[in-house]
Amino acid sequence: MILTTTNTLEGFKIIEYKGIVSGIGVNLQKQTLSFSIKKYNLAIAEGMELAKDLAFKNLEKNANDLHVGAVVGIKVDIEFTASNFVIVSITGTAVNFA
């Protein structure tokens, strides 16, 4: 499975567009400000990484369900809820190529 932020696949020709696919990852560990800003920042970074990994796994699963070889035009959006949960959503276009 090729995952790319570009709209094309260099060296390949896109032969079929199967639609938009997405993946969402949520880190349910609430991030709270502690006495150490360094620890808080590390917790935020770890939470974002966990949510991003989960979102990419979900994106790839959804793309595999469509029997495609690639997802192009990927866009990653990272948000924090009012409760300081990290949410990562990823969207792209599922394609087959030759």
What residues fall within each predicted segment?
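Short, solvent-exposed loop/turn elements at beta->coil junctions and helix N-caps
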Residues: 6-9, 75-81
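Short, well-ordered alpha-helical segments
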Residues: 19-75
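N-terminal presequence-like segments and the immediate start of the first folded domain
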Residues: 1-31, 64-65, 69, 88-98
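A generic structural micro-feature
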Residues: 84-86
